[in-house]
Amino acid sequence: MRCPFCHNQDTRVIDSRAAEEGTAIRRRRSCPACERRFTTQETVLLMVTKRSGATEPFSRSKIIAGVRRACQGRPVTEDALALLGQRVEEEIRSRGVAEVSSHEIGLTILGPLRDLDEVAYLRFASVYRSFESLEDFEREIAELRAERTATQG
C-alpha cells in the first residue's frame, strides 16, 4: 500500500481489526520512510449486473436515491432511508456472493420498504414490477391489506 503522505510503496501494517459489523477490515499502517501513520479500510467489492448485462460496483447511495424518489412527499426521514439502505446492503452481502443482479436488489428493497411506508412501497413496486393497469395496483393493495389483517388478527 502506498503512503498517502510521501508516496513510499513500502508500508507496514501495525494493527488489523474487523469493522462495519464484519463486512470490512480496518488496518492501521505505518510508513518507514516518513514515519507517519494512516488507516485504510478494505471491503469486498460487490458487483451489480444490470439488465443490459453491464456490471458496476454496488452503491448503497443508489439504493437510497431510488427509495427517496418513492418516498417523496411522505413522512420518511433521511435516517430511516439510511437504515433501509444499510439493511438492504447487509442482506445482500450476507448471501456471500461477489455479483448480484439489479433485479435481486429490487426484490430485497421491497420488504424493508413495505415496513417503512406502504405508499412509498406501492410507488416503488409499481415501477419495479412494471404495473400496467389499475388491477395491478388493486391486487398489490389487496395483498397489503391481507398481510396487515394477518399480523393484527
From Swiss-Prot:
GO terms for molecular function: ATP binding; DNA binding; zinc ion binding. It comes from the Bacteria. Its cofactor is Zn(2+). A zinc finger (unnamed) spans 3-34. Residues 46-136 form the ATP-cone domain. One of its GO terms (biological process) is negative regulation of DNA-templated transcription. Negatively regulates transcription of bacterial ribonucleotide reductase nrd genes and operons by binding to NrdR-boxes. HAMAP family: NrdR (MF_00440). This is Transcriptional repressor NrdR. It comes from Thermobifida fusca (strain YX). The gene is nrdR.
